[in-house]
């Protein structure tokens, strides 16, 4: 059984979509609710309905209303940057080699080195493997943009090892 959206859920989803703010924090929607408890209830309901996905402790992703059957995909590099809050990470492995056109194979897994977190995360059928590495051991990295959003990736020279 499919659940629809309530009037209040639809109101703040529409506000976020009008501002094209698909990645949001709790402060972005706080004005729509009387209390933090009410906000937590609505976020929980939307997570159950598949309209909101929690990326990290404070950041969420809003699946747009225009997504058919609640199926949506986002650029993996943008997703990784948002999960890591834009700092202390670099994308490596087959994903970096594919980005630099060193290999033709589309990567199954996105390898991300960071001093903060580790483990495997799966969002939108994208498998992200976080591995720990000290910041002093980071190789030469490059900042690039995709759809106006910056992300950090291993340099072309560093990506040759995953060719």
Q: Where are the regions that the model predicts?
A:
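Short beta-edge/loop segments at beta->alpha junctions of small alpha/beta modules
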Residues: 2-86, 123
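Short amphipathic alpha-helical surface micro-motifs
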Residues: 4-7, 41-44, 72-73, 91-95, ...
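Helix N-cap / beta->alpha transition motif
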Residues: 25, 92, 153-157
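Generic detection of long, well-ordered alpha-helical segments
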Residues: 33-36, 86-90, 158-163
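A general, composition-driven signal for non-globular sequence regions
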Residues: 48, 88, 139-141
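Short, intrinsically disordered/low-complexity patches at protein termini
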Residues: 48-49, 77-79, 94, 129-131, ...
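Active-site nucleotide-donor binding segment shared across nucleotidyl transfer reactions
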Residues: 51-68, 88-114
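Phosphate-handling catalytic interfaces
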Residues: 98-163
């Amino acid at each position: 059984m499919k659940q629809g959206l309530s009037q209040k859920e639809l109101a703040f989803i529409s506000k976020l979509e009008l501002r094209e703010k698909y990645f949001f924090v709790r402060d972005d929607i706080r004005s729509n609710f009387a209390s933090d408890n009410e906000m937590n209830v609505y976020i929980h309901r939307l997570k159950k309905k598949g309209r909101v996905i929690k990326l990290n402790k404070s950041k969420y992703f809003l699946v747009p209303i225009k997504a058919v059957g609640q199926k949506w995909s986002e650029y993996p590099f943008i997703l990784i940057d948002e999960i890591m809050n834009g700092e202390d990470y670099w994308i490596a492995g087959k994903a970096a080699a594919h980005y630099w056109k060193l290999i033709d194979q589309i990567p199954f897994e996105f390898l991300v080195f960071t001093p903060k977190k580790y483990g495997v995360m799966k969002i939108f059928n994208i498998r992200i493997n976080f591995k720990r590495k000290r910041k002093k051991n980071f190789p030469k990295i490059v900042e690039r943009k995709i759809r106006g959003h910056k992300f950090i990736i291993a340099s072309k020279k560093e990506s040759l090892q995953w060719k």
